[in-house]
Amino acid sequence: YISVHVRAHGREILKEYEISPPQFVALQWVGDKEGITIGELSNRMYLAHSTTTDIVDKLEKLKLVKRYKSESDKRLVLVKMEETGKEIINKVINKRISYIRDITAHLNKKELNLLPEILESILRESEKNIHG
């Protein structure tokens, strides 16, 4: 179960930054837009509005995101990424890439070249099973 090990390692990386996996997912969604409402973030994460608010509160406390009033509609509050949030995302992703490189270092060039094709094939097959 490779995914179990990769996820476990990912959680360990996040602990270094005192961020939970759902908080990191939220941070990534916030980073994908120039501003996102709590409601939109809730929908994207399939979480209750209150749960998403708690996540954003924690991220704001860590100075990774900030709430702003929308310029076009003062009733809307947008969540935007702070520079420290961008830095955390980059550091975490780089550590994940490094981990994948480490665990594939024993593969020869031919195996490494085949790996993406094999993974794509497995993904297509799994999607067939899900979608009938």
Describe each model-derived feature in a short phrase.
Residues K110-G132:
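C-terminal regulatory/oligomerization modules of transcriptional regulators
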Residues A8-A48:
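N-terminal helix-turn-helix DNA-binding core of bacterial DNA-binding proteins
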Residues R7, D57-L114:
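Charged, amphipathic alpha-helical coiled-coil/dimerization segments
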Residues Y1-H5:
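Long, low-complexity, charged/polar intrinsically disordered regions in eukaryotic proteins
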Residues I38-G39, S50, D57, V77:
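Residues within helix-turn-helix
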